[in-house]
Amino acid sequence: MKIIAFYLPQYHTFPENEQWWGQGFTEWCNVKNAAPVFQGHIQPRIPLNNNYYNLLSPETVKWQVKLAKEYGIYGFCYYHYWFDGKMLMEKPMEHMLADKSIDFPFCISWANEDWTRAWAQKNKEVLIQQTYGDEAEWKRHFEYLLQFFRDERYIKNEGRPVIVLYRADKIPCLEKMLLKWKEYARESGLPGLCIMYQCASYDHRRDKAGYLFDYGIEYQPNTVRIEQRKTLQMISKKVYHIVSDKLHIPQKLNSSISYSYDDTWKRILQMNPRDEKMIPGAYVNWDNTPRHKQHGSLDYGYSSEKFKKYLSAQIRRAKEVYQKNYIFLFAWNEWGEGGYMEPDEQEGYARLKALKEALVDTGELE
């Protein structure tokens, strides 16, 4: 089973972030400044040995890859930020490409969203807008990506480089752009592209461009949250305290939203794929209060033992129900959202050990 972990590159300084958020800002600032939002909530999460690394250090990436390989992760899916030719946080991915000594599969997810001040809960001022341009812009973007597609380590499906679109529903020119990208791929000597979408806000069955996608990723817990939120919205504040125990939701001490880890995973394991295009997802934990403070959302009831149990079940379902040899995992290093596999002071290597044991127990360790 090939487990591909989503990879956040925001662990180094760059001018735009310092302009918007202050000198020296990286994702680690959110992580360090995190605080509990209710009694028993574990924050901040601290990397083992205070390893607040810099992704521009070659040694950091080599350490990450060594760790991922040792514990059974197949590859990384790098988030890529492209705004009409303007790029942010491109250096870690470019350094990976340049250093051929790093023997590890990787692919790219274009995180095509506006950047706003929503993190800070100040307002939704747009810091940089996501636009899509014209055909010339699509070609510039493809030509930038082509150097990665041609790398022998790049993840491919039947020779076709995998490219993931984070928010396919946000692209007004989706059909025209994807048709052109496929054309550019053929002109470049590639056998084609393997195009996937990530967020559950898009459904290939309901869009005229849906036929251009080879696969859809059940990005978790994003996908299952849609149904959970519907349940929450049906509960009025008036009767919340009566039904909270039955829904496994702790009483709110603030405006954060809490979800049961067990309930979330049980819903995931009960899902049926939309059709044969779907690739299953998994997640280790969820807690975005380091970014959103008391306005965030989080899971409660997590343990590495539970993660192992649920991941084992999802690996079996990937083979038996989805008939796929891939699972996309949230995440390798989303410390600001609770989705990280890297060792921390609280659990040490427990998350990594749980993942490897799940692969071993299911006979799927490659």
Features from the language model and the residues they span:
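Glycan-processing catalytic domains of CAZymes
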Residues: 1-366
